[in-house]
């Protein structure tokens, strides 16, 4: 819709304007971001090709000159004779017809279109016309459309010191599924002081949020008083330490993140701290002194749908199969992930336009793992995700060495990806 109607973050009329970081993540071989980009390269991603042409020195990462990148993308699209560019705000989606539509409007989707997406997302018997006419507040969410995300850190299971923690469920109800990190009064005081001193991410004006009381950043809870955490996410009541027979002064609970039990979520630890500060503060928690993090906590403005409820593995809506979602609005996080899902949606849309059924990408690939997460995560607690090895399926054999395990996962992913491309009639681009 730019420049007819702009957003609070964009400055130009160019496509693909990068408003935050200029980094497209690690280019180190056998890392998860590298794997996703390698699959994109083999699928012939135009945006990745342009990013390489606009790259600036950034060590082992792919970073771009953001002005040159946006200009080159805009030029490539406007010069393509088969693409018609319409500079106008879209406020409705034709879900009833058979025209394939991809919704890829990003985290700053306009309010009018957000209302339309909320209407599409409602169960059919509840999607009444007058419902869509009510404005959706941007500090709230509808049942299937959210306006900011709150993400708790995820720690690698192998990096938890199990000699310092214990398994238990609160009041011994159900099975002992939580890892509990107990704190003494002194340990809690050190953690609390470090948390209050930690630096937060600086917000732009358009990113400022009005938090839900039920989903406050942990540092915001801490600012309300020295004991607020002990009566909130670090509440020890009902979590007796079997080693001492006593209730700890405070407890941090870790919840299993996947079926493989190789990663754990820090319950209630969504935060708005800088990543380096998170690592420093969270490693003060007993048992996490040497913690390795798959993901750090985040809270930021973000419009996205409850994809596990709404989307198929082909990124099509379950209720409206001619409508596909891609990019951050479908529940992925980051430039590379957004480009990748856009590429996938485009491939599926092309198949549909040719009268073919879209073929889901293989589960073992980075493409497939990213979409599998988006479409199979717990819809009651769905949060956007970056590509990490945590999303990829485990190997058939256990490999303790992390680097070797990741190398083998990448090898399997690319083999499966190439076979999928061949089956879909799009031979992979070789090096």
Language-model features: locations:
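Flexible, glycine/charged-enriched surface loops at secondary-structure junctions
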Residues: 203-209, 290-296, 356-361, 428-430
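C-terminal auxiliary extensions adjacent to catalytic cores
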Residues: 385-431
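A glycine-rich dinucleotide-binding beta-alpha-beta segment and adjacent secondary-structure elements
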Residues: 266-332, 339-341, 359-376, 384-386
């Amino acid at each position: 819709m730019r420049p007819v109607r702009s957003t609070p973050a964009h400055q130009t009329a160019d496509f693909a304007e990068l408003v935050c970081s200029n980094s497209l993540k690690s280019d180190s071989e056998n890392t998860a971001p590298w794997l996703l980009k390698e699959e994109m390269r083999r699928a012939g991603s135009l945006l990745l090709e342009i990013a390489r042409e606009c790259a600036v020195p950034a060590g082992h990462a792919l970073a771009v000159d953001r002005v040159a990148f946006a200009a080159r993308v805009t030029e490539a699209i406007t010069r393509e004779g088969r693409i018609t560019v319409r500079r106008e705000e879209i406020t409705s989606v034709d879900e009833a017809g058979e025209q394939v539509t991809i919704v890829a409007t990003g985290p700053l989707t306009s309010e009018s279109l957000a209302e339309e997406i909320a209407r599409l997302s409602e169960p059919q018997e509840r999607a009444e016309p007058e419902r869509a006419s009510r404005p959706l507040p941007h500090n709230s969410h509808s049942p299937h459309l959210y306006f900011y995300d709150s993400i708790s850190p995820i720690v690698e299971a192998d990096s938890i010191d199990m000699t310092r923690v214990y398994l238990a469920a609160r009041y011994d109800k159900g099975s002992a599924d939580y890892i509990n990190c107990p704190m003494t009064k002194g340990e809690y005081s050190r953690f609390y002081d470090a948390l209050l001193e930690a630096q937060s991410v600086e917000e732009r004006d358009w990113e400022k949020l009005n938090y839900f009381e039920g989903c406050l950043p942990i540092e915001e809870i801490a600012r309300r008083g020295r004991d607020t955490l002990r009566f909130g996410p670090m509440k020890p009541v009902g979590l007796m330490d079997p080693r001492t027979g006593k209730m700890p002064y405070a407890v941090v609970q870790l919840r299993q993140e996947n079926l493989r039990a190789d990663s754990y979520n820090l319950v209630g630890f969504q935060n708005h701290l800088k990543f380096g500060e998170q690592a420093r503060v969270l490693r003060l928690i007993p048992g996490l002194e040497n913690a390795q993090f798959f993901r750090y906590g985040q809270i930021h403005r973000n419009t996205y749908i409850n994809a596990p409820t709404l989307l198929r593995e082909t990124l099509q809506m379950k209720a409206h199969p001619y409508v596909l979602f891609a990019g951050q609005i479908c529940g992925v996080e980051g430039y590379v992930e957004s480009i990748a899902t856009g590429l996938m949606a485009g491939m599926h849309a092309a198949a549909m336009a040719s009268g073919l059924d879209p073929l889901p990408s293989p589960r073992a690939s980075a493409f497939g793992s990213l979409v599998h997460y988006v479409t199979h995560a717990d819809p009651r607690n769905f949060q956007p995700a970056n590509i990490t090895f945590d999303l990829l399926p485990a190997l058939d054999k256990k490999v303790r060495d992390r680097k070797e395990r990741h190398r083998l996962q990448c090898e399997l992913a690319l083999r499966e990806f190439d076979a999928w491309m061949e089956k879909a009639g799009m031979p992979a681009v070789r090096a």
